[in-house]
Amino acid sequence: MAGITSSTVGFNAVFTGITKTVSSHSLFSVDSKLCSLRLSKTELSFTNLTPSPRRAFAVTCRFGGGGGGYRFSGDNRRGRPKEAEIDEALDISSIRSATVRLIDGQQNMLGLVSKDEAVRMADDAELDLVILSPDADPPVVKMMDYSKYRYEQQKRKKDQQKKTTRMDLKELKMGYNIDQHDYSVRLRAAQKFLQDGDKVKVIVSMKGRENEFRNIAIELLRRFQTEIGELATEESKNFRDRNMFIILVPNKEMIRKPQEPPTRKKKKTAENEASASAAEITAEPEPEPEPEPEPEPEPEPEPEPEPLQIDS
């Protein structure tokens, strides 16, 4: 926008027999949305000046607003942008504990160090000190390039959003007389595509006299779908043309289940059960203790024979 850059305004002043010093003072300073006007005069010293001297004032008028200056009440201009708020993950001052558990940039656990020592080590390595677990006792912090870490997190999040909103169509081609190895390769590729959330189109091309083996091609496609199992459902198929195909759509419920990692406790219990069962199989049965022999009854004493009496 056009504006007045500078102009000179004169005035007459009468000074007689006095000494007067005029300090530098801004007579008028206004900043608005449309115009910024500043009127000022420099420091002057007059001693016994003759009447009617001409002094010059510099008037600068500029359109387009600007920073600083006086703001009228009701002026809704946007102020200067505030400093970026500190990310909570970088706010080390929020840690009340004097010690922290430190992890370096190479994923090595350095153990317990003082908070000041952790800050110093991060500064020496020219890395950011990021809070991983603020509620732990003591809190866990890590040295890393936080801007790079956030970029990778945002990129990973965008990729996940793309997968949820967009579904690509992957094509797999094979002949009716494909060998077992090539068939297994295509089967694994289809399983991977389906787990990534993409559709899979399996095509069997029939050329020339191969059309006579149409039934074999149909059985091959049915076998392929059967071995995919519950990982996908059939969306459409075409067994009439020379290029026969079947389109499989991923089953979201079956895809989510493998992504849930088993907890350590479950893994340990499974290992314990397996080891216990193996021990039961390999362990020999302990011999039963032999019964103790019953004590034999003591023989009763024989009665003494009565003495014979002989009559004389």
Swiss-Prot record:
GO molecular function: mRNA binding; translation initiation factor activity
Residue ranges, annotated region (Disordered): 253-312
Compositionally biased region (Acidic residues): 283-305
InterPro entries hit by this protein: T_IF-3_C_sf, T_IF-3_N_sf, Translation_initiation_fac3_CS, Translation_initiation_fac_3, Translation_initiation_fac_3_C, Translation_initiation_fac_3_N
GO terms classed as biological process: chloroplast organization; leaf development
Main subcellular localisation: plastid
Matches recorded under Pfam families: IF3_C, IF3_N
GO cellular component, one term: vacuole
Subcellular location: Plastid, Chloroplast
Protein name: Translation initiation factor IF3-2, chloroplastic
Species annotation: Arabidopsis thaliana (Mouse-ear cress)
Species classification: Eukaryota, Viridiplantae, Streptophyta, Embryophyta, Tracheophyta
Gene: IF3-2
